[in-house]
Amino acid sequence: MNSLSTEQLGIGYGDRVIVEDLNISIPKGKITTLIGPNGCGKSTILKTMSRIMRSHAGAVYLNGKAIHKMSTKDIAKDMAILPQTPEAPSGLTVHELVSYGRFPHQSGFGRLNDEDRRIIKWALEETGMAEYAERPIEALSGGQRQRVWIAMALAQGTELLLLDEPTTYLDLAHQLEILQLLDRLNKEQGRTILMVIHDLNHAARFSHYMIALKKGTVIKEGTALEVMTPDILKQVFQIDAEIVTDPRTNKPVCLTYDLIKNEKELVTV
């Protein structure tokens, strides 16, 4: 069962075509990761699937409904999006930012009710940010800020979370902190998660499903073991990679790789 899908989706900037005839389905209740080289269309696809960008052809379907026919508020009730390097208004506290997640559910003057407060408290606790509720966003570390943004997304009460490079600019410990949080949200609450990640080993470790892209085209999709193979990485990234399976996770790990400079060495998969 799929909660988010595209049908013959076409995306572009002016006369430049980025993606054409894209057909993908995001498995419900799973973590799916888009991988591919810079400029392959990963973030563009994510933005279009969340209606931040408009498509020039085809459609995106959210729970069976075409999103271009849905109101922004209705979309926000079903799907939360965390863009790359989001910026909070100056002087905002953690609690204030997380409370913005309740906006799609409010009416009238937009005042928080008891249910809103309960959900905000829960989101802060789930992300380990309750003790920082009254702290200014500017006073937080990079990893803490990302957790606050995820808390805001949780406060929306959506089943579907879209994240564009949620570990960008974070050190290794903070990267794992964020990915383990997303993994827990998926396992304990059944959240459907679609994200863009550059680190292949992180993508493989934390994903149920991977979609490898090159120049706006799907090269391979499937489990990490099916997608992260030497042949696929050679075609997508132009690298000669050594892949082993981690016995603890049964997931593929890229041990080392070299750049392929001779196009004759590339294979068509």
Curated annotation (Swiss-Prot):
<comment type="subunit">
    <text>The complex is composed of an ATP-binding protein (FhuC), two transmembrane proteins (FhuB and FhuG) and a solute-binding protein (FhuD or YxeB).</text>
</comment>
<keyword id="KW-0410">Iron transport</keyword>
<dbReference type="InterPro" id="IPR003439">
    <property type="entry name" value="ABC_transporter-like_ATP-bd"/>
</dbReference>
<dbReference type="GO" id="GO:0015625">
    <property type="term" value="F:ABC-type ferric hydroxamate transporter activity"/>
</dbReference>
<keyword id="KW-0408">Iron</keyword>
<feature type="binding site">
    <location>
        <begin position="160"/>
        <end position="171"/>
    </location>
    <ligand>
        <name>ATP</name>
    </ligand>
</feature>
<dbReference type="GO" id="GO:0005886">
    <property type="term" value="C:plasma membrane"/>
</dbReference>
<keyword id="KW-1278">Translocase</keyword>
<keyword id="KW-0547">Nucleotide-binding</keyword>
<comment type="similarity">
    <text>Belongs to the ABC transporter superfamily. Iron (Fe3+)-hydroxamate importer (TC 3.A.1.14.7) family.</text>
</comment>
<dbReference type="InterPro" id="IPR027417">
    <property type="entry name" value="P-loop_NTPase"/>
</dbReference>
<keyword id="KW-0067">ATP-binding</keyword>
<feature type="binding site">
    <location>
        <begin position="36"/>
        <end position="43"/>
    </location>
    <ligand>
        <name>ATP</name>
    </ligand>
</feature>
<protein>
    <recommendedName>
        <fullName>Iron(3+)-hydroxamate import ATP-binding protein FhuC</fullName>
        <ecNumber>7.2.2.16</ecNumber>
    </recommendedName>
</protein>
<dbReference type="InterPro" id="IPR003593">
    <property type="entry name" value="AAA+_ATPase"/>
</dbReference>
<keyword id="KW-0406">Ion transport</keyword>
<dbReference type="GO" id="GO:0005524">
    <property type="term" value="F:ATP binding"/>
</dbReference>
<comment type="function">
    <text>Part of the ABC transporter complex FhuBGCD involved in iron(3+)-hydroxamate import. Responsible for energy coupling to the transport system.</text>
</comment>
<dbReference type="Pfam" id="PF00005">
    <property type="entry name" value="ABC_tran"/>
</dbReference>
<feature type="domain" description="ABC transporter">
    <location>
        <begin position="4"/>
        <end position="240"/>
    </location>
</feature>
<dbReference type="GO" id="GO:0016887">
    <property type="term" value="F:ATP hydrolysis activity"/>
</dbReference>
<keyword id="KW-1003">Cell membrane</keyword>
<dbReference type="InterPro" id="IPR051535">
    <property type="entry name" value="Siderophore_ABC-ATPase"/>
</dbReference>
<keyword id="KW-0813">Transport</keyword>
<keyword id="KW-0472">Membrane</keyword>
<dbReference type="InterPro" id="IPR017871">
    <property type="entry name" value="ABC_transporter-like_CS"/>
</dbReference>
